[in-house]
A protein has these predicted regions:
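Cytosolic ends of transmembrane helices, especially the final helix of ABC transmembrane type-1 domains
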Residues: 252, 272-275, 299, 347-376
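ABC-type nucleotide-binding domain
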Residues: 392-650
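Loop segments that connect adjacent transmembrane helices in multi-pass transporters
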Residues: 172-175, 245-296
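Hydrophobic alpha-helical segments in the permease module
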Residues: 124-135, 227-230, 301-316, 334-356, ...
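Transmembrane helices of ABC transporter permease
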Residues: 81-87, 197-248, 321-332
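Membrane-integrated ABC transporters
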Residues: 1-96, 106-124, 138-142, 146, ...
Length: 650
């Protein structure tokens, strides 16, 4: 109980009773390097309250064992060989104390004893070499199996992530998913090392204990082994406490790293708002929590090590004393005493190793449970080729789209309907502009059409087929070219970003190069790449940060055009461009649209974007309140459109 109170975040109970409560005042409590200046900050208290709402670490259950066996099964040949090597090395180690006892008994036996010692010394040397070779084989086989398991796990886990619906990423933090892809899978794959250590320790402990029973008179066994039982029980209880504190420290460290990753990813926003000091205070607040948990972990770990070192030393003295008594009484020989002492030490250390391996296996199963939470709920999606084969209609014809009584709410906000009974008909080849206030649901229409979300009610018809019911979302996406208001580029060259949506088959590379060249020229990407030293091979940087906002948007437009889509979706696509670039892109898009004969959906706030549209739909509170030819709508605007024009919200 004293140790439990000492490890608690509130501190020891005995200190709480001291005059003036020295623990809470900070006199006896270890001072954090940040506490003195953070406790006065409101952000610090917010961080403290946030840390209390910690997510519990998934407890390992027996349900994870079948999945663990499924992961290990492809490596069963390696594991069988590793188990054989483990048994060989354990046999060598267990025979060593017996041979050493025989050698000691032959000391002082004259010429015959000397020959015996020489022969058995050579035999012991050969056994040591054989044991080392067996250990090498065991570790090599296990380590290679670990790498193969980690490879498959990461491959399956990443596949499961990229196939999850977008709503999953709205409800889960990217940092946590990346941590599972890295640390949790690494810890899960290390279960083989822990299991082999546990098996080896169990074999050594069991055989060592049996040898002790054989060497020691029965009336002395209880007195010799009773300290082992006491050390074992105490070590198990204390070890659980240490693991719980270590898990708390890891969780708080993960929170700090996640915050740092998020803020460094948005460093431009931090710098724009001069928020460096604010972020430093917030990060130091989280580090303070890590420090407190780390101090508790250090104290508990040091106590556990002290316990085992002290207990092991006392146990060794206990063995020496009892062996001395037995030798003096003539019960056993000196050689038998040496063997007995070595077996006792091996059994004691093996029990300790088994406890440590058991705790590590529990951690591995806990990490495995986190990974299985994703793998076990991964959606099975049909291959794109099957969807394309099932689709009908000419590949070159524009898409016809119809929204029929569509309602939708985001999974993260189920209480707020974004679309309510929306009806919208986009004929094949039409160029429809969607107007509306911010938050009216304009961009949600594009997200639903791209299949990133499924409507909660209603149907979306594409070329006369129910996109959701007939599972044509993947095929529909292959027919779309989407340019969003937030351009997203990857950390690769501009050319690779433009050809991202094209076939990766090397056979199509020549055709891809031609499409990239034409799309880059149409989107005016070549206007700025021609002046760069590496041209289209220039790296875009992480998230495209090496390019300006307008340049990123033009690359995104080229990426959409390179697919020769049957429908183009512009969601504020030119909002990041200056007037000159916007005019040039509009002219290029007008040429592309007239030559490609594709449908077009334009979500915009700018009147200039309406010049190449022939239909206008006005969206208000998640529903289309006016729809028709552009000239008719602008000449007879509804109340919602009048309000938009009056407030100059274009």
């Amino acid at each position: 109980m004293l140790v439990r109170r000492l490890m608690s975040p509130q501190g020891p109970r005995c200190f709480a009773r001291c005059p003036g409560n020295l623990w809470s005042s900070g006199v006896l409590r270890p001072a954090s390097p940040f506490r003195s200046r953070l406790v006065r900050q409101p952000l610090y208290h917010a961080v403290r309250s946030f840390s209390k709402d910690e997510k519990p670490t998934p407890k390992p259950t027996a349900a994870g064992l079948p999945q663990l066996w499924h992961l290990l099964r492809p490596e069963r040949r390696r594991l069988q060989l590793a188990l054989a090597a483990l048994c060989a090395s354990s046999s060598v180690n267990l025979s060593y104390p017996y041979l050493m006892g025989r050698l000691v008994d032959m000391f002082g036996e004259g010429q015959e004893g000397l020959l015996f010692v020489m022969d058995h010394t050579a035999l012991c040397g050969l056994l040591v070499v054989a044991g080392g070779a067996a250990t090498f084989c065991r570790l090599y086989l296990i380590e290679t199996a670990i790498e193969r398991i980690a490879f498959r796990l990461r491959q399956q886990f990443f596949k499961a992530l990229v196939e999850r619906p977008i709503a999953f990423f709205d409800q889960n933090k990217t940092g946590e998913l990346v941590n599972r892809l890295g640390n949790d899978i690494t810890m899960t794959s290390r279960v083989l090392i822990d299991a082999s250590a546990g098996i080896r320790g169990s074999i050594t402990a069991a055989v060592g204990t049996c040898m002790i029973f054989q060497l020691v008179p029965r009336e002395m066994i209880l007195g010799l082994l009773s300290p082992v039982l006491a050390l074992f029980v105490t070590g198990v209880l204390y070890g659980r406490l240490v693991r719980r504190i270590a898990e708390r420290r890891q969780q708080r460290l993960a929170e700090a790293v996640q915050r740092a990753e998020e803020r460094l990813g948005g460093i431009r926003t931090v710098r724009t708002f001069n928020a460096e000091a604010r972020e430093l205070r917030g990060f130091e607040g989280l580090l303070d929590l890590v420090y407190q948990a780390g101090w508790q972990n250090a104290l508990a770990s040091a106590g556990l090590s002290c316990f085992f070192v002290t207990g092991g030393g006392l146990f060794l003295l206990h063995i020496i004393y009892n062996c001395g008594v037995m030798v003096s009484s003539g019960v056993v020989s000196v050689g038998t005493t040496v063997s007995l002492a070595m077996y006792c030490l091996m059994a004691g250390s093996s029990y300790t190793g088994v406890m440590a391996a058991y705790g590590d296996i529990q951690k591995c199963l806990g990490s495995l449970q986190k990974v299985l939470d994703i793998l076990g709920t991964a959606e099975v999606r049909p291959a794109l080729s099957q969807s394309v084969a099932a689709a009908s209609g000419a590949a070159s014809a524009p898409l016809a789209v119809k929204f029929e009584n569509v309602s939708f709410f985001y999974p993260a906000r189920p209480q707020a309907n974004v679309l309510q009974g929306l009806n919208l008909d986009i004929p094949a080849g039409a160029r429809v502009a969607i107007l509306g206030r911010s938050g009216s649901g304009k961009s949600t229409i594009a997200l639903l059409l791209a299949g990133l979300y499924a409507p909660t009610e209603g149907k979306i018809w594409v070329d006369g087929h129910d996109m959701v019911a007939e599972d044509r979302t993947a095929w529909v996406r292959s027919q779309l070219g989407v340019i969003s208001q937030e351009p997203t580029l990857f950390a690769m060259s501009i050319k690779e970003n433009v050809e991202y949506g094209l076939s990766p088959d090397p056979v199509d590379q020549a055709s891809n190069d031609l499409k990239v060249k034409e799309a880059a020229a149409a989107a005016h990407v070549t206007e700025f790449t021609d002046g760069l030293p590496h041209g289209m091979d220039t790296l875009a940087g992480e998230r495209g940060q090496a390019l300006s906002g307008g340049q990123k948007q033009r690359v995104c437009i080229a990426r959409a055009l390179a697919r020769t889509p049957r429908m183009l979706i512009f969601d504020e696509a030119t909002s990041a461009l200056d007037l000159r670039s916007e005019r040039a892109v509009h002219e290029a898009l007008q040429e592309v649209l007239s030559s490609q004969n594709c449908s077009c959906l334009v979500i915009t706030h700018r009147m200039s974007s309406l010049q190449w549209c022939d239909h206008v739909a006005v969206v208000e509170e998640g529903a289309v309140v006016q729809y028709g030819q552009k000239e008719e709508v602008l000449q007879n605007p509804c109340t919602a459109l009048q309000s938009i024009l009056r407030n100059d919200e274009f």
